Structure formats: structure tokens, C-alpha cells
């Protein structure tokens, strides 16, 4: 296609005269008042047309002569057309030559201007492969104190090199090394290890994308070149070297917790387990029991004597407890040591309170003349039995078990064994005759059994077994008696305090 057909004159005589390189006609038009920077429909000025025209005939002149004349008549070299190109860009693009470029630069053409595609005059000169024009441009940049860096990256579909230029920047590393990878170029891969994982296979946790995805064009690998794709590989047996977020899973934590709990349970003996559960049951409830029936006439004296009367509590429980263990069935019970220091302190304080209350109650009964009349002096054998009973199992340890059984309603088991009805205030509990004599301050029972029942020690074991297993069972409130007691229901009244006796207690 002819170059003259590409230029749109649109009836503009000045642009048409410049396009045909008619210098005399151009002078006449300018002297006649034509506007020198008038543009056509593409935004091109007469100076741009003069830089890009290639029309040659007998009356035409050269480009440099036409450009020089227009610049002398105040043509603007920095005007840009609709595509953003200036006259200098058109001169470099159409290979106008170094003479035309020098004229434009001397007239004040700007080298830093860029079109809408981001290209400058330097880029167009490089793409046109015009070395002479490029030297002129570089000289002009150096004269202004600017450093030009040119990097050729690829070729366009037409075969020309697509270039980019950078001003006021240090030179890039052109030795062919791969640039540093950006976070968007990193490909993270995670995979779970199978059970039968081979030691020869590698699991890639981190990897970089291929070079061609980053803009590279060479896919071959050179052994002498530095590594471009660092890979962290791990084998199946080397799972311990993996990160903590891969190894630690909720299931593994749960298994470790169960294993440690089983080891702790194996260290606990059955006796310690019984002691734990017995203490928990004994300390979880506060039992309210009635220990004495008192005929009160003067409530004022009773209130004043209330603090001292409380010191005789628990003594009745101790005697009833010792009746369960005759002389022939005395056994030593080993008290398991609790691991909790608080429970040990509670146990020690309970023993001390029992001893103090028992001593105070015994002294009170021995000082009462009315209560000591029917008491016979104890024998030597009774004294030995009393000494043995002191070393019997602690009442505080097993009284809790007795009181745990006490609130249970009488079931078929208690009716079958004909257990004796027990009342705390007026105790119906059988007492040994020798025990009654060896304990001063207590009245002897009305019906004395010459052969005291021997309580089976298995009852205590049965109670502990049921407590340790956590089963709910009906147990009798008193030990099993021989057959001769089936038709007897003893109801014994211990004592009753009158107002005079309460006054004596206050003054005691």
C-alpha cells in the first residue's frame, strides 16, 4: 500500500503540501496564514507528517530540509497524536535518519515521552534497528545526565524484538541466573503418608513452579548451572523430622492421654482404691444422729449445759462398735495411707477428738454416784480385753460405714435375719456383760447372754466390697445373731437425765 494513502489530509492543504514535500507550496500556505500545528482526524500535525513521509518526485525536497523549515516556523515537536506518539517517535519508527532526530532534539523534543502503549522514542529506535539514530538518542540522554538501560526480552509476532527501557536504574544481572521466586510462584504440596510408604519415594512438601510459568523459555536443565528449584524431600521412616503441625493430631493426643491414665491406675492397689471410695462417701455427707434421750424441765439450765453435754457424744457409738468385736475375734486392721494430705489431717483430727470425748465421758460417769452403784469392779480378764479393744480398728474409720448403712430402709434381708431394732436414744443394741462391767458409768443390760455372739468378720469385708464396687445393696443395721434370738426383740433404755443431774453437770 502506498504511504500517501495512509496519510489523511481531510482537505487540509498544508498537511497535503507537507506530505508531498512541496517546500514552496508550504511556504506560501504559511505566509498566507495557515496554522502550522493544525492536525488531521488522527491528531497528526504537519511536523509529524514531514517526519514520516516517503514521497519522492522531481519537485519534492528531503525530510531534513522540510523538518528544519517547520521547526524554524515555531512547530511544536512535543505534540502527541491520538495514539500518544510524538514527532520524535514517528521519526524513529519510520527510520527518518539521525539528521532529522538531531533537529528535533535541538528544538526541544522530549526523550521521556511515552505513547499509550508505554513505548518511548528509544524503544522505537531499537525496534527499528537503526544504530545511527540510537547513538544520537543515547548521546542526548548522556548530555542531560540520564543513564539508559536497555533489556531485550522477546520478539513480537512480526519478528521484531520487543524491548523495554528503564531510566535512572542500575544495570540488571545479565549472567542468565534465575530471578528470586515471589510468593505467588511457590507451590506448596501436602500429602498424607500411607502405611506402606517406601523409603525410596520422596514426599515433596515445598516446590517452585516451572521456569516457563515464571516467564522463562528454556526447559532444559544444565548440570553446571546453579539449582533453580529447591526441593525439600522427606522419606517415609523420617516422619519424626516433619513439622509439628503434621505430627500432632487430636487422635494421637487422646491415645497418649489414655495410656498415661492406665499407667496411673495400675499403680493403685485394691486397698487404696477402697480407702479412696470410703473416704469420699464418708466426707460427702453429714450424718445427724440422736445420741441421748433427756427429760428436760428447765430449758435455761439445758442451754447453759449444752456445751459440756456435747463432750459426751461419740462415746455411745464407740461402745456399740466395740461390742461388734469380742475378745475371740480381735483382728488388726491396717489403715491404708491416703495420698491426699488433707484427708490425712482430717483423719488425725478425728482420732484426737474421739479420745478426748471418750475420756471426758468416762470421767463424768465415774463421778456420778447414782450411776456407779450397780457397777461391779472389773476383773483382770476384762481389763485385758479392754486393752485389746483399744487396739481394735478405729471407730472413725468404720463408724462411717455403719452410719452409711443406717439410713437404708429395712429390706427382706434384715427381716430374714431378724435384726434387732436399733434406736439411738434408747439403745436396743446387745452389750456383752463383761464389756458392761469393764465400762464404768453404763447400766448393765436386762437380759444378759452368757454366750455373746461372735460377729463374723466377713461382714466388714462384705461392706467394703460393696462400697468399692459402688453397688447399691440392702444391708442389715446390726450383725447377724444366732437362732435363739429370733423371737426376742430387746428394747433397752440406757438412762435419763433429770434437771438436778444437769445442774451437777454444769457445776462439774
Swiss-Prot record:
Q: What domain of life is recorded for the organism?
A: Eukaryota
According to its UniProt entry, this protein's organism is: Mus musculus
- One of its Pfam families is Ank_2
Chief place of localization: cytoplasm
PTM summary from the entry reads:
Phosphorylated.
State what protein this is by name: Ankyrin repeat domain-containing protein 34B
Induction info: Up-regulated in bone marrow upon differentiation (at protein level).
UniProt subcellular location: Cytoplasm; Nucleus
Sites bearing Phosphothreonine, chain numbering: 269
